[in-house]
């Protein structure tokens, strides 16, 4: 009997169920699976209506904090999380603010300059709906190749380099030098959402232009500058960008593939316990999501 294989099969079987909101299945599910005397899998599954990628490690750390406090015989730590109602109230205030108007103007201009969306699928993008029926493939650089490349290009941030490589790769797959992709923003910094667990992420259109004469560091630096500018306006909903142009959301997709850089802190501080986080699934996908995982050792997986 392979206890690790059995545990992974249990988790995959759970993920492959009909887990839509109206399925009757629990929206939150935790399971401890013992595979050896001193080794366990702590399986966690949440519906995306409840959490996003930022929330997972935050909730896990709080559970670990409670566990450690109980081990020491201490009272249960107070919750560090902001009620989600505060996030909703803050967003409603934003909708009535000058910042909303500035963001609307910024995205209207971005929309005018945006190249057509790319897709690897022959099916048309309009009319598609996000699905949880997802084909997942994990790609990893071997033997520290990404770490070596990042060392050679020391003037470029690792996350910027990872994004530039992925943008080039996607352009090559689509045979496109100019295309629009989605980029996931957390929409939390400077907001009540920074200490809330509900889902607030926003997927916004990123125009990618690949210049034949440009070097990889130059592309990485330019994309980073684009994202920095977009980040100032990340609270504005992508659906609203489409509505502002007189179309219905979903009628005219702004992008196909979505790029997602995941740099969350997955480390848990539990005395006497070594932990490692494995991401088994993400939220629903409309076309293609490329999730980039730079790790603490300087390597990269997609």
Region roles according to the model:
Residues 1-9, 13, 24-26, 61, ...:
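Short amphipathic alpha-helices and their capping loops
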Residues 1-44, 109, 116, 131-144, ...:
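Acyl-thioester-dependent condensation/acyltransferase catalytic cores
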Residues 45-47, 264, 295-297:
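C-terminal lobe/hinge of AMP-binding adenylation domains
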């Amino acid at each position: 009997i392979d206890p690790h294989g059995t545990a992974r099969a249990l988790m995959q079987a759970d993920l492959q169920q009909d887990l839509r909101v109206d399925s009757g299945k629990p929206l939150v599910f935790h399971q401890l699976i013992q595979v050896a005397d001193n080794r366990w899998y702590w399986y966690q599954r949440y519906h995306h209506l409840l959490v996003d990628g930022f929330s997972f490690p935050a909730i896990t750390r709080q559970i670990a904090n409670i566990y450690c406090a109980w081990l020491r015989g201490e009272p249960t730590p107070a919750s560090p999380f902001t009620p989600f109602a505060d996030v909703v109230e803050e967003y409603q205030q934003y909708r009535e603010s000058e910042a909303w108007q500035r963001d609307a103007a910024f995205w209207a201009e971005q929309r005018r300059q945006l190249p057509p969306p790319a897709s690897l699928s022959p099916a048309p993008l309009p009319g598609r709906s996000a699905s949880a029926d997802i084909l997942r493939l994990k790609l990893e650089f071997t033997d520290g190749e990404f770490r070596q490349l990042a060392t050679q290009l020391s003037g470029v941030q690792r996350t910027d380099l990872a994004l530039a490589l992925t943008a080039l790769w996607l352009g090559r797959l689509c045979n496109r030098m100019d295309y629009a992709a989605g980029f996931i923003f957390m929409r939390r910094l400077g907001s009540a959402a920074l200490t809330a667990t509900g889902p607030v992420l926003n997927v916004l259109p990123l125009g990618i232009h690949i210049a034949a004469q440009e070097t990889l560091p130059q592309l990485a630096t330019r994309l980073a500058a684009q994202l920095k500018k977009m980040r100032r306006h990340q609270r504005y909903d992508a659906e609203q960008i489409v509505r502002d142009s007189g179309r219905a959301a979903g009628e005219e997709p702004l992008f196909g593939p979505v790029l997602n850089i995941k740099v969350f802190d997955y480390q848990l501080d539990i005395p006497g316990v070594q932990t490692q986080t494995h991401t088994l699934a993400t939220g629903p996908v409309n076309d293609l999501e490329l999730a980039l995982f730079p790790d603490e050792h300087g390597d990269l997986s997609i």
